[in-house]
């Protein structure tokens, strides 16, 4: 797979006191696998061992983040199977169980970002991997007890939200290890590895719980207990803490006062939020709307969305993130209209094909909108203020990543509200159509319209 567009996230920065110290030709560890001197921009340091250390940390980070996304999406696999296991749940309650992990995951993303400089990247990766044991074990217990109250089920589903926070801390940590010339590729690989977890869990878990006689839902949680322990052990043995990394609260403050942060966050709800929301809801939609079709094919949508994200970044590098984002909202609109036609005619081929278009549009838009961020904050900035612009872009990426994830909550709840109020999912899809058209219009008006402040820039 080709490398995605560069996505710099310099949410950690070097402590000036350490930066002034002589930098050794290779990383030197002290107790606790702390590295006091880290200068990836120095070619001698980078060739002398820096690259090897950075790549090792990246590989282990991808695995831990991948597991986080798997656990985050775990309830999307289990919920459609709960009624068959003896649980009496309304469709509204099922969509609550699907939506609440995204609500929690989005909310903890910014705190997770600041945990890395506070505790160290290695230490926090160990802690966050061990935290995955809690939702995995809780799910394994409650799914074997059909008499469990909905409130307890909802609390256990909420615990899975910790997996959604792993993305933020992982990206913040890896952003510090690589030089600017290689940071985009490294972060793209890190993000892609995480996003793939959503599709992989929907592909693998149904097979795991079906091995042998009957359906064993508890295995959906149990299978991740040794995998999470392995992630913690690998991080303990192979990852590093960088003492020169410190939280950059100022970048978040600068970004929060810039209107483009909130415009892009709004757009990111439509791209990344759509990816998470549709990925979570798709198995339940298939189960309830087309019960004659197996839900085991639901994973295809999430994989399409994850694999098309790098494509969106690459195309945006050539044509500009704003143009590609507008095109992606066009795909999302077409997909939603197609899904409406599929529901109205009860045509599974039309419905499934339309959702593949939705996932494709969400994935491409995910990469393209992300690509817009550094371009927006760099536009029209002279060399003297470039460092401030980079800080603002870093803060924007953190904020947009958190806000965008709320789409994973809004989409399932939109489906639930429409079904409960109108007895059909169609009104929710029409609302999504209007939202995508509005997002396309906002992107055009702010970044493409002739006469707009940034129209002359390649955004």
Predicted regions and their residues:
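Extracytoplasmic gate region of multi-pass secondary transporters
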Residues: 75-80, 258-306, 310, 370, ...
């Amino acid at each position: 797979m080709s490398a995605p567009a560069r996505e710099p996230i310099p949410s950690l920065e070097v402590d000036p006191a350490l930066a002034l110290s002589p930098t050794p030709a290779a990383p030197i560890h002290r107790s606790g696998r702390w590295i006091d001197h880290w200068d990836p921009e120095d070619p001698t340091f980078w060739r002398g061992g820096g690259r090897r250390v950075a790549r090792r940390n990246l590989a282990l980070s991808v695995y831990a983040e991948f597991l986080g996304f798997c656990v985050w999406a775990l309830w999307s696999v289990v919920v459609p199977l709960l009624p068959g296991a003896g649980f009496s749940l309304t469709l509204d309650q099922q969509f609550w169980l699907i939506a609440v992990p995204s609500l929690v995951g989005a909310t903890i993303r910014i705190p997770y970002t600041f945990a890395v400089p506070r505790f160290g990247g290695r230490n926090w990766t160990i802690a966050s991997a061990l935290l995955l044991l809690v939702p995995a074990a809780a799910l394994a217990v409650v799914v074997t007890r059909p008499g469990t109250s909905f409130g307890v089920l909802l609390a256990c589903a909420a615990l899975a939200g910790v997996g959604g926070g792993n993305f933020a801390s992982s990206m913040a940590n890896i952003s510090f290890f690589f030089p600017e010339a290689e940071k985009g590729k490294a972060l793209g690989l890190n993000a892609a590895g995480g996003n793939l977890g959503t599709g992989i869990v929907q592909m693998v878990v149904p097979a795991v719980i079906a091995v042998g006689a009957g359906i064993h839902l508890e295995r959906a949680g149990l299978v991740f207990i040794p995998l999470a322990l392995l992630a913690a052990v690998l991080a303990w043995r192979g990852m590093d803490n960088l003492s020169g990394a410190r939280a950059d609260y100022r970048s978040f403050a600068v970004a929060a006062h810039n209107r483009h942060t909130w415009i892009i966050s709004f757009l990111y709800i439509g791209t990344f939020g759509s990816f998470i929301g549709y990925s979570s809801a798709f198995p339940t939609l298939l189960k309830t709307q087309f019960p004659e079709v197996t839900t085991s094919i639901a994973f295809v949508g999430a994989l399409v969305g994850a694999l098309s994200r790098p494509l969106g970044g690459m195309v945006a590098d050539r044509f500009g993130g704003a143009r590609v984002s507008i095109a992606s909202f066009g795909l999302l609109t077409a997909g939603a209209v197609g899904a409406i036609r599929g529901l109205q005619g009860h045509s599974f081929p039309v419905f499934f094909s339309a959702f593949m278009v939705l996932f494709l549009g969400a994935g491409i838009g995910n990469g393209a909108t992300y690509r817009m961020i550094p371009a927006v904050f760099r536009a029209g900035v002279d060399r003297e203020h470039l460092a401030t612009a980079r800080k603002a872009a870093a803060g924007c990426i953190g904020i947009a990543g958190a806000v965008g994830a709320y789409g994973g909550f809004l989409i399932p709840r939109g489906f639930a509200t429409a079904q409960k109020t109108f007895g059909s999912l169609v009104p929710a899809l029409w609302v999504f159509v209007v939202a995508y058209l509005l997002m396309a219009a906002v992107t055009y008006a702010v970044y493409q319209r002739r006469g707009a402040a940034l129209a002359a820039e390649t955004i």
